[in-house]
Amino acid sequence: LRSLLKKRGYIRRCTFQNIDFSVMHAEGLGLDAGTIYKDCIFMGCVMTKEMKSKINKTDLIFSKMDVPYNSFRNTLYTPEMLYEGYQIGTPDSYKESFDYKVYQHYLDKGKVATDIKETLARTLHDHSISNALHDLLSHYDEKKVVGVMGGHGLSRSDETYKKIALISKDLTERGYLMVSGGGPGAMEATHLGAWMAGRPATDLNEA
């Protein structure tokens, strides 16, 4: 990005996602009077006055939307982001977390929302997360990525749950990246196993 913003003349056919251009300008980047953006897309960016003067009529600008999540994220979420505000041992504190607030918003708007702004925000968010996931996976050998989907109804007491966790633990220790749809059951077991990689199997049993 920084090397791109040092260019003079037209910057063409680029998409900028969740970029704070005030930070770039504070570093002296993107301020050249001869720089013009053409056929570019700006998604959820912070646009300065100087930046707006460089916009061409061929550009598209998507402003941030009034929803409790960022529709234009350019990275995946971390556990710390999702559970900020939650305190272990205090179950009610989960209601202070980003994860809870967004889920409540989802329920309030409806699983199948009728508000076009909400459906657009969700679709753009899914698109952004897909991009971030592809960026992450591009750093891995595709033959070293193992995905587990389904098995929502598998209970933690089921022997198959334990088997999946052990398989995931073993594969993670052998350098594989374990991915899932993020749901309960088999998918939860997948991440439990990956989390327990490098620890004795007895620790997994206790968990």
Label the model's feature ranges.
Residues R2-E206:
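Glycine-rich beta-alpha loop segments
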